[in-house]
Amino acid sequence: MTEHRLAVRHFAWLAIILTGALLQACGPNDKGAAGPKQRVFAADVAGGAKVCEVPKVSPTNDQPTEAAIRMTNDGGWCGLPVHQSESKPFSAGLLSTRPSHGTVVIHQVGDETRIDYTPDRGFAGTDSFVVKLLPGNASVRVTATVSGPVA
């Protein structure tokens, strides 16, 4: 019984040491450059459309930012990443104009806010919607061009 407890205790210490080493590996290196900053998990990319083309978007408070996305309708979503200046995610997003042929989900993924559009089943064509981002007065007008699934 004593030998078993000793083995479990050593395993626990080994796990703590390895966790610390892993966290240190993700930090700054000896040249001062930062390690990986944005964490994206498998759940963040699962279910995405096979074809999804999105532009780089940096919304400002002055006027609505235009974003055109192109995707196939294979049952998946197409995600448009947006962030405030200094790579800071927005706190929230409000759907001010709804899409006519799909759904929108606004959520945070790593250091960005992501606007996910999923077209209705069988839809092919053009759809659009507007998202207001908080804090501030930034908004994004998204035009989605959806093609049928690739065979």
PLM regions: where:
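A short beta-strand micro-motif common to beta-rich folds, especially ectodomain repeats
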Residues: 124-136
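Post-signal-peptide N-terminal segment of Sec-exported extracytoplasmic proteins
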Residues: 46-87
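C-terminal edge beta-strand
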Residues: 32-55, 68-69, 137-151
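Surface-exposed or secretory-pathway low-complexity segments enriched in glycine-proline
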Residues: 73-110
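Bacterial signal peptide processing site
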Residues: 27-30
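C-terminal motif of bacterial Sec signal peptides marking the signal peptidase cleavage site
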Residues: 22-25
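Bacterial N-terminal signal peptides that target proteins for export
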Residues: 2-14
